[in-house]
Amino acid sequence: MELIPNLSIETWVLLAISLVLIYIYGTYSHGTFKKLGIPGPKPLPFFGTILGYHDGTWKFDETCYKKYGKIWGFYDGRVPVLAIADPEIIKTVLVKECYSNFTNRRSFGPVGFMKKSITISKDEEWKRLRTLLSPAFTSGKLKEMFPIIGQYGDTLVKNLRREEEKGKPVNMKEILGAYSMDVITGTSFGVNVDSLNNPEDPFVQKARKILKFNFFDPFILSIILFPFLTTIYDLLRFSIFPRQSTNFFKKFITTMKKNRLHSNQKTRMDFFQLMMNTQNSKGKESQKALSDLEMAAQAIIFIFAGYESTSTSICLVLYELATHPDVQKKLHDEIDSALPNKAPVTYDVLMGMEYLDMVINEGLRLYPIANRLERISKKAVEINGLFIPKGITVMVPTYPLHRDPEYWPEPEEFRPERFSKENKGSIDPYVYMPFGNGPRNCIGMRFALLSMKLAVVSVLQNFTLQTCEQTENHLKFARQIILQPENPIILKIISRDKPITGA
């Protein structure tokens, strides 16, 4: 049997040309940074440098930061991405030229009607949504909403007390994931779901399906390797957001809106109601009101963007408190002083706790959940001698910036005092960006901080946290787009009504 097929010369030529064209297609953009004189890891055909994500994007960025400095280039498949860690250039990208050039984030696959969400929308549509939604996230509105959020803090304590009475270490992500889910669904959809004790509730199940996003999923990988497939997937009505879940929430929004419009009960002040309030006659005339579909998109994106980030951040802060008893004691003292005899938590008292704020900020520095900020350059531009071509994706790597010893002495140490009144003013806002920066920063920043602070105070008001045999001494992080522990954080919790024994 012949190993080489007996083909005509013409066939061999066509085959060779085809292979060359395929190779060119898979590599044609891979010379972008070499031409610009920008260093970076060597790309592979089609894959670019994404195989470097095997330990997580945060680790890839940290490695590149140490090797190449404050500017480097890499490739997500065939897409060139310019990493910028220079504070002055970051300021220009995120703030100074946000409206004129760096307005939009990267399009990432087919998203269906979710393109109407504030996170994914572009240009004038984004500006319109930001204008409509920003009033819902002011301090005043959050204070009005606090009684709703506060009840989930009570549920959190009840769930923890039930676990504590079992006398076993607690999986903190399980408990705090339920808290985060309840807060977001309660404020975005106006429903009370005790998700820890009702895991089979269809609302909880549909929400959790939205959260299953894996960079190495074959569907996602196909989009990275062959971007043209996005157009085909759009025509086929495929989406990175599961249709079963998005359809469920669309129907739910319509039903909930009808119920509220025809209800004689006092209006519940939550994000859902605030979105409904844009649909007044004046808003309709000016075409500024949110449509029902846009309301659904915002509510879904709140789950997608808020659940994992908030619950993981709280877990990591509590982990640091358990491993730093001196910090925990100091925070216990502040809580006991501000809320004597376990007084109910109020918005004003919560926001006035200085040491709590320091602890939360330091936790977000060590563990920036959104470890990348991205913008697209709409036109060719030069910033501080750096030429940025039109259409290039610009990425700010927050993880290595948050741990750079140039800005943070002994960066691996958990030191809330970095964010004291005396020190906070000296922190460059472009090397500390847990919620991004500029006009397109995280719109839910105040809400996320409020949720985190309420959870931490609710826990520490009632419990002391300790490490146990199952607690990892050095956390390992998963191969995910966002920063999250590979294994659950397990802690021992002790009621403060009981005497504390050794760990």
Curated annotation (Swiss-Prot):
Protein name, per record: Lithocholate 6-beta-hydroxylase
Cross-referenced InterPro entries: Cyt_P450, Cyt_P450_CS, Cyt_P450_E_CYP3A, Cyt_P450_E_grp-II, Cyt_P450_sf, Cytochrome_P450_3A
Group of enzyme by EC: oxidoreductase
Source superkingdom: Eukaryota
Chain's role: Catalyzes the 6 beta-hydroxylation of lithocholic acid and steroid hormones.
EC identifiers of the protein: 1.14.14.138
Cofactor (UniProt): heme
One record GO biological process: oxidative demethylation
Xref: PANTHER family: CYTOCHROME P450 3A-RELATED, CYTOCHROME P450 FAMILY 3
GO molecular function annotation: heme binding; iron ion binding; lithocholate 6beta-hydroxylase activity; oxidoreductase activity, acting on paired donors, with incorporation or reduction of molecular oxygen, reduced flavin or flavoprotein as one donor, and incorporation of one atom of oxygen; testosterone 6-beta-hydroxylase activity
Membrane topology summary: Peripheral membrane protein
Pfam families in alphabetical order: p450
Protein family per UniProt: Belongs to the cytochrome P450 family.
Source organism (scientific name): Mesocricetus auratus (Golden hamster)
KW Cell cycle (keyword) present: no
Swiss-Prot/TrEMBL induction comment: P450 can be induced to high levels in liver and other tissues by various foreign compounds, including drugs, pesticides, and carcinogens.
Gene3D superfamilies: Cytochrome P450 (1.10.630.10)
